[in-house]
């Protein structure tokens, strides 16, 4: 065997070992979440300040202000084109521990999952279903990964099937091992959404999450089972070959399924996120791209964000995906205007009234 062949064989063996270690790490994280070790009181989870809450903005007036578990997200900076949506705080924390995760900015960097006892969640939903008269999306993936513990989320998901007005939104980065309950029993009041990213981004900063391809596979299975299935490509990082990677991601995605909606977003560097990520000693290379300071933390430069959105809009359009089903998340009013997009002031474009139907 030649030296070149030996080196090639060595590289292949090293890559296989790395892939095996990564897979084992994900499996251990998944198994760990099945073991409920800690609960959180409703009064405590109510007081957790969403890391993206903007304290200087005047609170929008609501007919019902929520309870301890179902709460409105309604404090956004005046220059951001975001509005009210409803959080379902059934749990806090996430075992996937992505380097850039904004949850690092809450609970002093604590990421270990804590769960509200199911009976409290169901009682809170009973009240919410009565007090909120209009069809509403309840986002179960704001302070946690919605599929991090299927055993805990199943009775909550099934609660939504007792009525036909409101829907639960399951936002996740888990793969096929956490979706069996969705495949076993079709449900009409459930929206599934996978957050996916370019392969290089996933390898660098989403190491414990399922690979992008595994997430696409899971989304495809759920979509084929009849669920309203959406995709969130966020945060989009301008890595050296970002155009090639995200173009490939779109091609891979659309070759497997046609999502009901697609959400795009770029990194947001809240100061607490950055501070507690440093304290956790994670790889901070994700923060190198920030160039602009906004009322919602650091962002990529305006022109770079605009270029990213235009590029992805063009690729989606070329692939035949309807742009009316694409939105951008937590962006400035100026960006919406620059892209020629329409938004409804005071309403969330991703989880609000306009996004309720597939």
Predicted regions and their residues:
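Auxiliary Fe-S-binding modules of radical SAM enzymes
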Residues: 254-358
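Conserved radical SAM core fold
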Residues: 144-147, 174-179, 190-210, 235-240, ...
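Glycine-rich S-adenosyl-L-methionine
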Residues: 209-222
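Catalytic cores of alpha/beta
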Residues: 241-256
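Flexible, acidic/Gly-rich N-terminal and inter-domain linker regions that tether
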Residues: 3-6, 13-16, 20-84
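Cysteine-centered iron-sulfur cluster-binding motifs in ferredoxin-type domains/subunits
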Residues: 88-98
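Conserved Radical SAM active-site core
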Residues: 58-86, 99-193
């Amino acid at each position: 065997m030649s030296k070149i062949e030996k080196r090639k064989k060595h590289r292949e063996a090293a890559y296989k070992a790395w892939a095996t270690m990564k897979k084992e790490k994900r499996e251990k994280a998944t198994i760990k979440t099945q073991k409920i070790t800690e609960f959180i009181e409703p009064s405590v989870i109510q007081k957790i300040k969403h890391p993206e809450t903007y304290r200087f903005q005047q609170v929008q007036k609501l007919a019902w202000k929520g309870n301890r578990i179902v709460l409105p997200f309604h404090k956004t900076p005046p220059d951001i084109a975001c509005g009210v949506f409803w959080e379902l705080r059934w749990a806090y924390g996430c075992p996937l521990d992505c380097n850039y995760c904004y949850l690092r900015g809450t609970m002093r960097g604590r990421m270990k999952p804590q769960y509200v006892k199911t009976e409290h969640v169901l009682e809170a939903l009973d009240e919410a279903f009565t007090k909120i008269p209009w069809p509403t999306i309840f986002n179960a993936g704001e302070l946690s990964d919605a599929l991090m513990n299927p055993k805990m989320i199943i009775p909550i998901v099934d609660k939504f099937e007792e009525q036909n007005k409101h829907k639960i939104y399951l936002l996740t980065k888990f793969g096929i091992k956490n979706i069996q309950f969705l495949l076993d029993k079709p449900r009409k009041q459930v929206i599934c959404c996978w957050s996916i990213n370019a392969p290089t981004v996933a390898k660098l900063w989403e190491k414990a999450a399922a690979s992008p391809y595994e997430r696409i596979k899971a989304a495809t299975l759920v979509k084929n089972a009849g669920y309203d299935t959406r995709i969130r490509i966020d945060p989009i990082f301008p890595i050296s070959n970002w155009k090639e990677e995200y173009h490939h991601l779109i091609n891979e995605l659309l070759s497997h399924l046609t999502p009901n909606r697609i959400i795009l977003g770029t990194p947001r560097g809240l100061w607490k996120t950055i501070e507690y990520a440093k304290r956790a000693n994670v790889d901070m290379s994700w923060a190198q791209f920030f160039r602009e300071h906004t009322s919602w933390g650091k962002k990529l430069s305006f022109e770079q964000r605009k270029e990213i959105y235009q590029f992805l809009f063009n690729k989606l359009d070329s692939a035949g995906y309807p742009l009316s089903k694409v939105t951008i998340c937590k962006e400035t009013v100026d960006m919406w205007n620059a892209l020629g997009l329409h938004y409804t002031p005071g309403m969330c474009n991703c989880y609000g009234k306009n996004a309720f139907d597939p």
